[in-house]
């Protein structure tokens, strides 16, 4: 008899968890508190309690080829970086393709998840839900928590003396939807993550002046990388990941600094991170430097104090007549339907084995999916988590002892602090490729490069030096997809397809350019020998 699995949430993590359950022959039921799928990526004009919220202009920071699910490439005519509405369209196509909607109970809130009395032997959970003011309960063999971590706004008002006397408007970035109504105003954005930068750029088009306050500075990275390809298809390769792992930290720091400053010198713009030793997640924004050059945005240090109409900064400068303050200060998270003893959140941190399993449970039948912030796309990350979890639920994969898991949690946390620092925004941070490979190894889906070098050297080279995308984890092992190899070799075609909207005649410019380079090199060689002859 198939095991019954409760999936909490029908966002990205919930949808892929449903599919993985079905793939493994499990019987899932998904509880979604709203009326539709998509989670944080479904824009709504109004902010709703208990639901993630985005602004209307949000575009993905990871490209389509690096973000799609492993056996379902995005349509080739989709843009490389997707507006939230386009990404939601992909999720709808995905859900329809794999017939996932029939497993979802919409407008159903999970009130509690509790161990059954015989949990130590059965591993079962009693899940209490509410729909249309009616409570129901059911017993499940396992639970997958996919409720996200961008719901509870973090506004540290105590860190801003004088906020109580500020006469202007202030709110968390979660409440921001579009620039209407902010025309001609002087606006202070506090926090320079992706949301803060996006909002500052958008408002700067029509505001009188926008200021953005950053405590530690940040690297700003363009979505466009070498030869115009998406940044993550260039940055996230196994070769580059290996270099970042084995080279001395000082060398890695230097490499990252050179790469980040290739676009513009961050020191000149007042953005250089205070501690460059940490691998802080960069801000992905193509407009920040141009808005700074235009003077539409001005970078400021930490806010020291607020008055009725002005902001005083730690460097002693003062900005008068501030109309609006937007706190882009991140989120905290909690699981109100779980007992604290199950998944305890302290200082925005949770102790989970590989960011997924509580280590202390007698039975490994509770898992958190997507509770992580990789330096890459969350979609393939959540998918590999769900693939592993469902195989653990089914008994095809096993977890180590509680002691071993706790040691791993401690060691992983120490490594995270060493790499990323102790900021609240970094508590879920992890390296991307290394983590994907780690999960793939657990389920037997990591490609064997030594074997491939002999069997399929062309593919081996592509896997090691090319973009590390999700298709690679469908080449071997459980869930193998026969289209994976083809998807890997045709990804460039799908990247370029939406860009080539203007027909061009065949041109010999490339060959002429190449010939000129050769002639130039020969000229240098001839000049060198002529100089030797006359000396």
UniProtKB/Swiss-Prot annotation:
Name of protein: Dimethylaniline monooxygenase [N-oxide-forming] 2
Gene: FMO2
Gene Ontology CC terms: endoplasmic reticulum membrane; membrane
Mode of membrane association: Single-pass membrane protein
Chain segments annotated as transmembrane: 510-530
Source species taxonomy: Eukaryota, Metazoa, Chordata, Craniata, Vertebrata
Cofactors demanded by this protein: FAD; Mg(2+)
GO molecular-function term, one example from the UniProt record: flavin adenine dinucleotide binding
Record localization: Microsome membrane; Endoplasmic reticulum membrane
Residues binding NADP(+): 60-61, 195-198
Residues at which FAD binds: 9-13, 32, 40-41, 61-62
The entry's keywords: Acetylation, Endoplasmic reticulum, FAD, Flavoprotein, Isopeptide bond, Magnesium, Membrane, Microsome, Monooxygenase, NADP, Oxidoreductase, Transmembrane, Transmembrane helix, Ubl conjugation
Family in the record: Belongs to the FMO family.
InterPro entries according to UniProt: FAD/NAD-bd_sf (IPR036188), Flavin_mOase (IPR000960), Flavin_mOase-like (IPR020946), Flavin_mOase_2 (IPR002254), FMO-like (IPR050346)
EC numbers: 1.14.13.-
Site of covalent link Glycyl lysine isopeptide (Lys-Gly) (interchain with G-Cter in SUMO): 492
Residues annotated with N-acetylalanine modification: 2
Main localization, broad class: membrane
């Amino acid at each position: 008899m198939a095991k019954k699995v409760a999936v909490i949430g029908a966002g990205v993590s919930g949808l892929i968890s449903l599919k993985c359950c079905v793939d493994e022959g499990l019987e899932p039921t998904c509880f979604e508190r709203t009326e539709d799928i998509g989670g944080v990526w479904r824009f709504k004009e109004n902010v709703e309690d208990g639901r993630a919220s985005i602004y209307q202009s949000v575009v993905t920071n990871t490209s389509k080829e690096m973000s799609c699910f492993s056996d379902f490439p995005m349509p080739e005519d989709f843009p490389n970086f997707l507006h939230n509405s386009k990404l939601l369209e992909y999720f709808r196509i995905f859900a329809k393709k794999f017939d996932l909607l029939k497993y979802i109970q919409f407008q159903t809130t999970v009130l509690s998840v509790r161990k059954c009395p015989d949990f130590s032997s059965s591993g079962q959970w009693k899940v209490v839900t509410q729909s249309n003011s009616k409570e129901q309960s059911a017993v499940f063999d396992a639970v997958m928590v996919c409720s996200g971590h961008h719901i509870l706004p973090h506004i540290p008002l105590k860190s801003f003396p004088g906020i109580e006397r500020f006469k202007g408007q202030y709110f968390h970035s979660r409440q921001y939807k579009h620039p209407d109504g902010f025309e001609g105003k002087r606006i202070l954005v506090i926090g320079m993550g992706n949301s803060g930068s996006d909002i500052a750029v958008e408002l700067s088009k029509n505001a009188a002046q926008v200021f953005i306050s950053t405590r530690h500075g940040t690297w700003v990275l363009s979505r466009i990388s070498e030869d115009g390809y998406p940044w993550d298809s260039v940055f996230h390769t196994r070769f580059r990941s290996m270099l970042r792992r084995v080279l001395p930290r000082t060398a890695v720091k230097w490499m990252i600094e050179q790469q980040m400053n290739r676009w513009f010198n961050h020191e000149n713009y007042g953005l250089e991170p205070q501690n460059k030793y940490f691998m802080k997640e960069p801000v992905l924004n193509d407009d920040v430097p141009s808005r700074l050059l235009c003077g539409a945005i001005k970078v400021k240090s930490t806010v020291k104090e607020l008055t009725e109409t002005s902001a005083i900064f730690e460097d002693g400068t003062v900005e008068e007549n501030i109309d609006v303050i937007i706190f882009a200060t991140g989120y905290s998270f909690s699981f109100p339907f779980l007992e604290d003893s199950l998944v305890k959140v302290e200082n925005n941190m949770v102790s989970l084995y590989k960011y997924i399993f509580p280590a202390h449970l007698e039975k490994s039948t509770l898992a958190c999916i997507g509770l992580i912030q990789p330096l890459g796309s969350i979609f393939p990350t959540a998918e590999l988590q769900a693939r592993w979890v469902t195989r653990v639920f089914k008994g095809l994969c096993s977890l180590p002892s509680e002691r071993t898991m706790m040691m791993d949690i401690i060691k992983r946390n120490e490594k995270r602090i060493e790499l990323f620092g102790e900021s609240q925004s970094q508590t879920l941070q992890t390296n991307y490729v290394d983590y994907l490979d780690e999960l793939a190894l657990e389920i037997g889906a990591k490609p064997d490069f030594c074997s491939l070098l002999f069997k399929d050297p062309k593919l081996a080279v592509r896997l090691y030096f090319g973009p590390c995308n999700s298709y690679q984890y469908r080449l071997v092992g459980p869930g193998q997809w026969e289209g994976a190899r083809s998807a890997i070799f045709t990804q460039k075609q799908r990247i370029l397809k939406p860009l080539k909207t203007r027909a061009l005649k065949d041109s010999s410019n490339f060959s002429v350019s190449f010939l000129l380079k050769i002639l130039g090199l020969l000229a240098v060689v001839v000049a060198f020998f002529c100089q030797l002859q006359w000396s």
